[in-house]
Amino acid sequence: MTQEEILAQFGPREAMEYDVVVIGGGPGGLATAIRIKQLAAEKGNDVSVVVLEKGSEPGAHILSGAVMDPKAITELIPNWKELGCPINQKVTSDDVLILSETGAQRTPDWLLPRNFHNDDCYVVSLSNVVKWMAAHAESIGVEIFPGFTAAEVLYDEHGAVKGVATGNLGIGKDGEPTENFQLGMELHAKYTIFAEGARGHLGKQVIAKYKLAEGRDPQSYAIGIKELWEVDPSKAKPGLVVHTSGWPMQDDAFGGGFLYHLEDNKVTLGFVLGLDYKNPWLSPFEEMQRWKTHPAIAAHLEGAKRIGYGARAINNGTPQALPKTVFPGGALIGCDAGYLNAARIKGSHAAIKSGMLAADAAYEAVSAGRANDELSAYPAAFEKSWLSKELNQYRNFKLWFKKGMLVGTVMTGIEQWLLPKLGIDTPPWTLHGDKPDHVNLEPAAQHAQINYPKPDGKLTFDRLSSVFISNTNHEENQPAHLTLKDASVPVNINLATYAGPESRYCPAGVYEYVKNDDNTDRLQINAQNCVHCKTCDIKDPTQNIVWVTPEGGGGPNYSGM
């Protein structure tokens, strides 16, 4: 049944009214809700706020490095430490390594560009921080609905956003309602704030509808693949932060590794790889596994046990690619807009700050009796904020590396080390990107096949054992949430021209080319494996794959990530 047929038979949907609806219970969305409630309490009035979170609980879908700059959360909740926020382990040392296949050259501290200095920052589990923020939000009156997906944007008769509808529950694989069917509900709001993270499903729709990216550079992304390890206490170095460049990346691909020592004998590590790479034989997952075998990385993991895995697409964070962030009835914040600072490898502080700025604008509008118009005060406040200044300081970082590792390293040194010493805080020039990531992929015939080593099950692993420890689960009897515009394209184009790149760029084994009984090929989609990273929606060379929301509560269930 189509959605129209379902509504005709089972509708209308129940509707709930709020002043502000926030889509996404990450750091940005929760900061928005908290800030609105703080302002309302200060002024002695009531503003109703609800947060929709598609994960089974707040933090379940949160994945980040993470080295956190506490600047924004200190502005939001000055006494976070006294209240028990799990931001505990200060950075004690920054190691930036340039790797060859077996060697590692440490960059002297005096030569480190400013973006690699993490003074006053903390190594955290962002998943745990978000869980704490959610509890704090609820304690001051924010409503949070975990396990509910925002599946559809609702518009009023003037074309303004008036809220969202949650997804139906109990639709079978055949598209028909099952005995467990529940119709989704509508949440109407004066303002709807989209905080879904990078490549947000609904954010993408409103950007297209209102032409918010017109005149801007195309947004660029990377995939971050992360593991959590428990190490021998004798190997623990709480507060040590390691970043690597060089091996195993070739010069035509942008990427690097991170390894952070948290408290409690935990080490979090991972690899970030730009999705503008050219070689369709490249596999981000295998590159990350191979990176761990380098002696400089493997030494941290001797006698350790892997206890967590996950992956997520992230923005590459240039102000040149930021869309217009407001439209009638709503706003984009955090990575849904693209505020991540790729040079500093940090996004949570930007998400929180952008959420606060949007909250200020939404609160003032609601208090003035406005509804469903543009929150123009939000982008105006952003332009005057420290966040805008910070992002502009690093606006060329990723774009220099598109010109190769040598050029990127030299120009980052000039912009982030030399110029600041000369009193020039922001580069006097601006680079621009010219095409989206998927356009860069080249036919397989133009590249040599990459043969990756088999995993050993101790230091390196396969996809399926990795997905298992991400605690990923979906209701099996539901339509696939990884949809194809044209079912013939994967075999006729992706496999024929690009050797089936989705089977390699997906870090969860969702896409698999198998043989039919007559020996023809077909693409099998193992949707239950999906960790909601959004890489397929970004990198598919024909843009034939569209990620839509599965039933609420499905997906990964990250703990300590």
Feature names for model-found ranges:
Residues 1-17, 42, 174-184:
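A short, basic/flexible loop-to-alpha-helix module at the beginning of a structural domain
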Residues 18-50:
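N-terminal Rossmann-like FAD-binding beta1-loop-alpha1 element of flavoenzymes
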Residues 25-26, 54, 126:
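Glycine-rich Rossmann-fold phosphate-binding loop(s) that bind the pyrophosphate
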Residues 127, 136-299, 338, 357, ...:
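Predominantly flavin-linked oxidoreductase catalytic cores and closely associated redox partners
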Residues 311-342, 466-477, 490-505, 512:
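FAD-binding beta-loop-beta segment adjacent to the flavin cofactor pocket
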Residues 338-344, 356, 360-405, 524-526, ...:
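Active-site-proximal substrate-binding core of FAD-dependent oxidoreductases
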